[in-house]
Amino acid sequence: MLPIIGIAGNQLIRATDTFQGNQVTYTPQGFVNAVQQADGLPIVLPISSPKTASAYIDQIDKLILAGGQDISPQLYHEPPHPKLLETNLQRDLFEAALISEALKQNKPIFAVCRGMQLLNVVLGGSLYQDLTTYPKWSVKHEQHPTAPQFATHEVEILPDTLLYQLLPDTYLVNSYHHQALKELAPSLKATAFSPDGLVEGIESLDKDVRLFGVQWHPELTHSSNSTDQGLFDFFVQEF
């Protein structure tokens, strides 16, 4: 049987002409394609009540947390910074419940960009709400409108980590974020850093807890970059 990979979905709330003014539940196509290419069965989990998280996690084998909006600073007890962008507290709370339930059921988690940030927050860490508050900021972390296949900066992968087994010790990545990990959650360790010292990868300190995250977007380049696809292959088939 194909492993069932739940992808935590996003919601388009503001009306657009593309969808005739309808709200839409969605996930980026790259996640769907990458999971299918890895011989997994992708299932999009729509934003729902946190009370339903256990029922959703019961139905899947593994969980992917995707990118999207900023994370509400309510979750780490800070007032909103003036440069905070769009948030969706309902999504934050639902995905936080998914994380807690996946950990409870010992089901693996792969967290990408916002997903990695939320994972850190749920486990007790905090964020830079905008990189202007990071004193060592010197790297272009938001490369828009440059296409994702054109990597914008390097990351250093630390030895004795999961990512070190999957990636070169120095790796070029795309970058689309203005928030970043600040205080690392006590149960996590950093596995990759940008040249200006921001955390670009995480995993659990407990080897029995199967989770890892990256700050870049491998789902945007998996079709042209076999190394990025390898992250999905590993997660779906081995992790």
Swiss-Prot record:
Indicate yes or no for the key word Transcription: no
Q: Which domain of life does the UniProt lineage start with?
A: Bacteria
Q: One GO cellular component from the entry?
A: cytosol
Q: Indicate the segments forming the Glutamine amidotransferase type-1 domain, all copies.
A: 12-239
Please name the GO terms that the record assigns under molecular function: gamma-glutamyl-gamma-aminobutyrate hydrolase activity
Which InterPro entries does this chain map to?
A: Class_I_gatase-like (IPR029062), Peptidase_C26 (IPR011697), PuuD-like (IPR044668)
One GO BP: polyamine catabolic process
| UniProt entry tagged with the keyword Iron-sulfur | no
| Name of the protein this chain belongs to | Protein NtpR
